[in-house]
């Protein structure tokens, strides 16, 4: 699995359950390393203030990611996979990653570090369509190129006809190479 391969890399050490401030200090880290990077992820969810956000079956993408990554606080999360269509609000990396997991072949996921309880639920999933809805258009989307490539390589992704027209329009005006690359991938997708 991913962490098994990484742990065999020369010069790589992975420590779990270490709390900076309790087990060691920031100064201790700097004493032994040239740089210290804190990669802790988003500290909290950002729930939308919309009607129905508190209903059963509604979860934040951060909660779903914690669920399929095996975080013990989210192992019992009720992730509703008993319907054919799921909607994800937002178009950042986490949204695309959740869409990729929900549409992935469970046999492919079995070769990853996905949590066993999530894999079992995904094997029984009735989800056949994932809709990503966002307030920003394609050129202002928050996802990165690798996340887009990961999703489009793993799933049959199509765009709403209006979004497809926006992509083509934005592509004509794109001067940023990264935005242009994202738009070129989106332009090749079929219409919904």
Where are these regions (language model features)?
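Phosphate-coordination loops involved in phosphoryl transfer and adenosine-cofactor binding
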Residues: 17, 23, 82-85, 127
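Flexible loop/turn segments at secondary-structure boundaries
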Residues: 22-24, 44-47, 67, 94-96, ...
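Short hydrophobic core segments
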Residues: 31-41, 86-89
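Glycine-rich dinucleotide-binding loop and its adjacent helix/turn
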Residues: 45-124
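Dinucleotide-binding/catalytic capping subdomain of oxidoreductase cores
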Residues: 100-192
């Amino acid at each position: 699995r991913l962490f098994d391969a990484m742990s065999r890399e020369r010069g790589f050490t992975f420590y779990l359950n270490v709390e900076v401030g309790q087990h060691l200090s920031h100064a201790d880290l700097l004493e032994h390393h040239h740089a210290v990077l804190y990669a802790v992820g988003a500290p909290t969810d950002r729930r939308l203030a919309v009607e129905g956000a508190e209903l059963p079956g509604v979860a934040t993408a951060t909660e779903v990611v914690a669920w399929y990554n095996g975080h013990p606080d989210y192992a019992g999360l009720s992730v509703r996979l008993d319907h054919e269509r799921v909607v994800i609000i937002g178009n950042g990396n986490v949204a695309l990653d959740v869409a990729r997991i929900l549409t992935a072949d469970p046999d492919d996921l079995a070769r990853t570090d996905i949590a066993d309880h999530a894999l079992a639920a995904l094997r029984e999933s009735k989800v056949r369509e994932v809709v990503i809805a966002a307030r920003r258009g394609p050129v202002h989307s928050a996802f990165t190129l690798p996340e887009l490539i990961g999703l489009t390589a793993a799933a049959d992704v199509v765009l709403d006809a209006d979004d497809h027209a926006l992509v083509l329009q934005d592509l004509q005006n794109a001067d940023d190479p990264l935005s242009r690359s994202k738009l070129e991938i989106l332009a090749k997708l079929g219409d919904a």
